[in-house]
Every structure is written in C-alpha cells, then in structure tokens.
Amino acid sequence: MKAVLAKDLTITYNGEVALEGVTFEIEEGKTLLLLGPNGAGKTTLLKTIACFHREYRGELRVFDREPCEARELIGYVPQSHSLNERVPLTALEVVAMGGIYRSGFVHFKIPPEILEKAEDALAFVGLSNVKDRLFRELSGGQKQRVLLARALISDPKLLLLDEPLSALDPSARAEVSNVLGKIKRERGITMVITTHDINPLLEIGDKVMLINRRLIAFGRPEEVLRDSVIKSVYGPLARVIPVGGKLFCITGDTHLHRHGGGCPR
C-alpha cells in the first residue's frame, strides 16, 4: 500500500502558492528524505499531510484516505516544540501527553496503562534513566528523543519529522539518527523527514525528494544527489563529493567536517 500518494498537488498558504504541481508516492515502511532551501515548502507539505493545513488542490492520500481521515495513523514531530517549559513536566509526563491526547483523556491524572506505554517509549529511545527529570533540564538531543518517544506512544504508521537534527551538536545528531534508524529497522514505520543537512540521514533514506516550491527531483539517493541537480537549487558552490565510497552533499547550509554521514554511491 502507498503510505502517501500525491498527484498534481498544489498547496497554498494565505492565498500564495507554497508548493506547486507535486507528484510523488511513498511505499509503506519506507523513508523519504525531504530536502530543499528555506522557504521551499517542506514544512508546509508535512503539515498538509498531517492535516494541520488544508489549503490544497489536487490529490493527496494517506493510506488511501483523505489526510484528515488518517490522523490517528500519523505521528508528528515539529521543528520547534510548543511546550511551556515553565511548567515542571518530567520527561515521562511529556511522553505520556501523546497517549493522553490520543485516548481522549483530558484530566491531569495519567492512567497507568498510558504511563506504562510512556516508559516503554522512553526505553525505546534510550532514555529510561531520565524519565523523572524535568524536560526543561534535558539537553537538546535528549529533548528531541523525548519528543520522538511522545510521537511513538500512539503507535503511528506514518511519522513526520520536521528538521529533527537542527540545532544539535554532532554527538546529539548521531544519537537521534541512531534512534531513527532503530525506528525503521524495528518498527517498520513509514517516515518523512525534512532536513537541510541530508548526510547524517542518508543511510536510512530509501528515497530523496528535492523541492523548491515545486518538485525538482525525486528518486533513490544516487539518482537525486548529483552535482547538476544540487547546483540547480543551491547554486554553483553546492556539490556532491565522493569520499571513501560515499557521497557527501554540500549545499551551503552544512560543512563536511560536522558529521560523518554520507550517501551510498
């Protein structure tokens, strides 16, 4: 089954075209890496798939349903969380919020079955040891893994992640990338991941889609990540460099020394 299917999809935002005439599909269980410069339409596309944004024309299906009919199948991790860190929530409570939202509970007493699922989700992302620590006291990488656990508690079939590696140091990037790889291997969840820096994620990417308010390229990493394609979006300084059997993609937003990821040749 197609996890996501888009045909001639045009998304508007406040009357302006944000993304025009895009056609693509994602097979269930596969990972799509969504690449493009600022303002390319990446976040708008994610929000439209998640039914947070509804101004579009053309066809968009999520597991053969309209996006808003498939919301219970979708987990979403935004680039910036909306939690008020002045509220003293523990890591466990933040994760449990994902289960409370899905179950319809609105009171402050967290049901035991949701707490158990929250503990399991924290264990999955390697953070059992911080479950009782305040969320606001965690490092950036730990916070991101807690937010991943919060999205996983509802057992989604599709996980949408907006810049999950942004503003993280190299060590935290590696930790989050490892968790994403674990999700792919052990859960088989379809993922769509937006990124400015594609290199740390390429080992889990089945397809890459490059957009800049329209579809520039879509296909396997080695099909999309070519000098001519990257330069057409990022300019003459962008390039793809073969190093040790891998390809490093330099777009101007990243530096080669910041990470050890690459794209298979």
Ranges and model annotations:
Residues 50:
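Helix-to-loop junction immediately C-terminal to a conserved catalytic motif
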Residues 58-70:
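Conserved ABC transporter NBD signature motif
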Residues 96, 111-130:
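Conserved ABC ATPase "signature" region
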Residues 134-138, 142:
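Conserved ABC ATPase signature
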Residues 155:
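Conserved catalytic motifs of ABC-family nucleotide-binding domains
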Residues 159-163:
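Catalytic Walker B motif of ABC-type/P-loop ATPase nucleotide-binding domains
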Residues 226-227, 233-265:
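ABC ATPase nucleotide-binding domains
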